[in-house]
Curated annotation (Swiss-Prot):
Keywords: ATP-binding, Cytoplasm, Helicase, Hydrolase, Nucleotide-binding, RNA-binding
UniProt-recorded name of the protein: ATP-dependent RNA helicase RhlB
Compositional bias per record (Basic residues), positions renumbered to this chain: 425-439
Role this protein plays: DEAD-box RNA helicase involved in RNA degradation. Has RNA-dependent ATPase activity and unwinds double-stranded RNA.
Catalytic activity, as annotated: ATP + H2O = ADP + phosphate + H(+)
Gene3D superfamilies: P-loop containing nucleotide triphosphate hydrolases
Organism: Shewanella sp. (strain ANA-3)
Family: Belongs to the DEAD box helicase family. RhlB subfamily.
Subunit structure: Component of the RNA degradosome, which is a multiprotein complex involved in RNA processing and mRNA degradation.
Chain's gene name: rhlB
InterPro entries tied to this protein: DEAD/DEAH_box_helicase_dom (IPR011545), DEAD_box_RNA_helicase (IPR050079), Helicase_ATP-bd (IPR014001), Helicase_C-like (IPR001650), P-loop_NTPase (IPR027417), RNA-helicase_DEAD-box_CS (IPR000629), RNA_helicase_ATP-dep_RhlB (IPR023554), RNA_helicase_DEAD_Q_motif (IPR014014)
Signal peptide: none
Catalytic EC class: hydrolase
Motif (DEAD box): 165-168
Amino acid sequence: MSQTHLSNQKFADLPLHPEVKQALAENGFEFCTPIQALSLPVLLQSKDIAGQAQTGTGKTMAFLVATFNHLLSTPVPENRQLNQPRAIIMAPTRELAIQIAKDAILLAKHSHLKVGIVYGGESYDVQRKTLDQGVDILIGTTGRIIDYVRQGIINLGGIQAVVLDEADRMFDLGFIKDIRFLFRRMPSADQRLNMLFSATLSMKVQELAYDHMNEPVKVEIAPEEKTSKNIKEEIFYPSQEDKMRLLLTLIEEDWPEKAIVFSNTKHSCENLWSWLEGDGHRVGLLTGDVPQKKRIRILEQFTQGQLDILVATDVAARGLHISDVSHVYNYDLPDDCEDYVHRIGRTGRAGNKGVSVSFACEEYALNLPAIETYINHSIPVSNYDRDALLEDIPPPVKIHRRHPAGARNLRERSGAGRPQGAHRSGGRPPRHDRTRRQP
């Protein structure tokens, strides 16, 4: 983590439970990020917060540290039943819930607290076995949690800490009725520690906070900056004919270590995957139609470096905590201005540098003025040399073709890695001999 991303506040200097301090130290957490430095002193006084921070600022660890500390420092409710978790963390997507659970397990190592996760797309029975053994911290999506509550498998009467993550996304996905349903089945707000985090604290999000929290303290981190200064943004105006060739050329020229390509529709994502797969890249596809187990496997492969490119709809734009994403490509400009911010927020995280490349094509160029108004700046325009675009592009593969197990043809991973300018056989010129930009 870059030192410029950290504050001067040390975790060791905060009045945290010894088991929490030990887990933080063992996992390399010494200094707080700004959102952690602002929120933890408030939360450690058992005061509720409504926090606003950009993605990648460490808010997940902020609420996890507060949750673990609160449970370890607070007596267990009298007559607590096995089906009563002590804390509940609600997330809008399965991917975010899974990532939160992974981070929670790091903190749980030295405590007696059990972490459980539930979400749709997986077997009820498998998840129920975990719940039947009792969990202290329940992490999940609202729909699956409600299913278990209605069946009596989960009872929320013993909740002592509540986290609502990505609250604005909850509104976008229509989950607010579910959230209110769950809040009504918990102890009153003054009997629990309540935490809400959101990329934006809109009026509707603040209303939700004040309805179900106990006089929350508002914590904000640089709300005026919707995009990180660590992200280099640029935009091209390709013709529809040039669009795919330009993307393939940019990827070969930039040669990103880890990239996400966003498109607006499932069909477009499948088309992108087919061309990238056909061009020899190690690429995964993440859309709403991909089965849950396959989605998890793809995310793990991407996180572990077995895939270099992830093609995704906006289902993956929020909540994915994947380190070292070097490039984000907006093949289509999103219709929603906030989606632009959340897409490019996948890179430039934790103080690292990132690159965002967007296409303002004939179909979606009309979205650009609203996006630039929303982010309060113009995106620098880059021109490209049409004669320098790739010509010898292999045909796309069919979507049902299984991903090859071998390494990406373009990149050699043995020894010192891919030599500069390495390329496929077939007469393609080295990447550094071709440039996309025009002076």
